[in-house]
Amino acid sequence: MRSTRLIPVAVLAFAVACSDTATSPTSVGVPLFDVAAGTYTDPLADPQTGIQDANAPSGAHLTNQSGPVQCVVNSDLSISCSAYSIAGVGNTNAFLSLEAVYTAIIDCNNPGNNKNNPIESHETTFSTEESATLTPGRNGTLRVGARSVSPFDEAQGCPNPNWQPEIREGSLELVSFTYSLHFDGFPAGDFAVLIEQP
C-alpha cells in the first residue's frame, strides 16, 4: 500500500525536475565550459624543438634564448602570450593570430545616472583579436613578439549612442581562445604553434 502512495509523489518530483524552470547546466545562463585563469602551452609541441616540427620548415627550432611558448589567462581574463624566436626558418614568413571569445552582461547607463540602476542591460558575445604577418630576419630567425588581448579593449555598444556601456561586474566569461602560428607554404590548419582552450 505504501508503494502506491509514493508513485504520485515520484511522478510530481520527476515533472518538476523536467520543467523549464528547473536548474540545469543548460539553464544557468553562462557558458558550460569557460576558460579559467592559468598558463597554457601547445600540447603537440616537440619537447626538443618547442614547436610542431611537421608544420614548420625543416630544421626550425626555438632559439636557446627563448623561453617556453605559452599563453597566460590572467585573473581579469585578459590573455598574454610570450615572446620567442624560431631559428632555421630560412625566408619563410608566418602568420600569427591571437583571438579570444567572451560573453558578458552589458549595462547601459545615462551619464550622470545612478550606475546601480542601468537604463538597459543585455547579454552579448564578442571577440577580440590581434594578428600579424611576420618576416624572418636575414639570418633565418623569426622573432615573435609578445601578444595580448583584453575584453576591455573591445568597444561595447548600447542602443542609444549617448549611453555609456559597462561590463557588469562578475558577468564576464572567457568562452575560448586560440593562439596560432602558421608558416607560409604549409596546408591551412597545420600550425607550428597552436594553443587553444577549450
Mark where each language-model region is:
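Mature extracytoplasmic or otherwise solvent-exposed domains
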Residues: 29-198
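Serine/threonine-rich, low-complexity intrinsically disordered segments
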Residues: 6-9, 25, 41
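Bacterial Sec-dependent N-terminal signal peptides
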Residues: 15-36
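Sec-dependent bacterial lipoprotein signal peptides
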Residues: 1-16
